[in-house]
């Protein structure tokens, strides 16, 4: 396992597909933390008004079911950033470099291997929009992501993301995911468990460690390698954590 982690870490900088090799196509049941999504027309009407945008967003989520930002492990936050949006603190609503990297990767592969969506884009999509793949829907996503970045801090956006994203196995948000997979509160997760959860949003069904333990373990190892590459953990910590994972 240690050799596998070392190989992954050394190869990350030359592998543009490492951060997303499975397209996000899963459809899940209605979330307990996100209410029924607003009509597109209603969302459009509220884009340009700061107060109305925040009102529209807050009306779509159940804040009382959120895990507060300071109760979410730093290792999970770092795992999500390393995996989903490694330049999170360096860009606004859209990561032009990330989009360019994804375009080159997908063009070379002849298929969609990597997405260029930022955490802000994923958050507004999950709260407001459908999974429809059209230019109109993408423009809506971009406009909403800009409003999100203008009106919420990076910490607030990450809190929204972690409390509304789908983690598979019927679990929306980090609170449900921690309970479903590990039978504990998020604050009690160890490094390997944080890495496992951080790898799920890319393809929740495919990487579900309960239904697909082998694929889940591979994904966890990849996330640990990404975290080591970004300097969040050491290669030794990545190798050690890759050797164990306890589900509930």
Where in the sequence are the language-model features?
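Juxtamembrane regions of bacterial inner-membrane/periplasmic proteins
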Residues: 1-248
């Amino acid at each position: 396992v240690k050799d596998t982690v070392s190989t992954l870490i050394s190869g990350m900088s030359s592998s543009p597909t490492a951060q997303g090799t499975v397209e996000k196509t899963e459809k899940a049941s209605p979330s307990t933390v996100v209410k029924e999504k607003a009509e597109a027309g209603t969302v459009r009407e509220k884009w340009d008004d700061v107060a109305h945008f925040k009102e529209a967003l807050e009306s779509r989520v159940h804040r009382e079911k959120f895990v507060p930002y300071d109760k979410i492990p730093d290792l999970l936050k770092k795992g999500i950033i390393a995996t989903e949006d490694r330049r999170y603190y360096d860009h606004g609503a859209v990561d032009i470099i990330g989009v360019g990297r994804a375009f080159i990767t997908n063009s070379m592969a002849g298929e969609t291997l990597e997405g260029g969506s930022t955490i802000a884009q994923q958050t507004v999509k999950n709260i407001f929009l459908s999974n429809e793949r059209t230019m109109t829907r993408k423009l809506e996503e971009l406009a909403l992501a800009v409003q999100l970045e203008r009106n919420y801090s990076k910490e607030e956006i990450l809190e929204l993301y972690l409390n509304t994203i789908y983690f598979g196995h019927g679990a929306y948000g980090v609170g449900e995911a921690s309970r479903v997979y590990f039978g504990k509160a998020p604050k009690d997760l160890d490094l390997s468990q944080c890495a496992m959860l951080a790898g799920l949003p890319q393809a929740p069904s495919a990487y579900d460690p309960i239904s697909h333990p082998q694929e889940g373990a591979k994904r966890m190892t990849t996330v640990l390698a990404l975290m080591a590459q970004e300097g969040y953990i050491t290669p030794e910590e990545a190798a050690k954590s890759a050797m164990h994972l306890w589900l509930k």
